[in-house]
Amino acid sequence: MPFLITIPAHAEWTRYAQLAESEEWFDPAIVRRDQDRITFWTMTNYTAPITSLEGQELLSEQALTTVDCSLGKIGSEKVIKYAGKNAQGAIIGSMETTLRMTKVSANAADRILLEIICAK
């Protein structure tokens, strides 16, 4: 069954990781919850421009992210790429895919995110 998902216009972003190449943020507002699966928006700000598959430079992206708290998995089904930081500026690309989830490793930044979201 199709459903409409909107991009958070006035999200209250919370930083959960500072890496050498990026800052990782999440919006604590839950888009959807289905038992142990929680869907919400994440945002990545890159410290330096990266080149997209389309050959354009981007500084940030948002992803519609789902975690499975019982299985310790994470995945994204929609990604929107922006020319500027904080999901600002021109949208230079987007992609929607079928949700494929992967196991989160113990020392990954996504482990921090999983623990925060699953504690809600």
Listing of model-derived features with the role each one plays in the protein:
Residues 1-6:
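Bacterial N-terminal signal peptides
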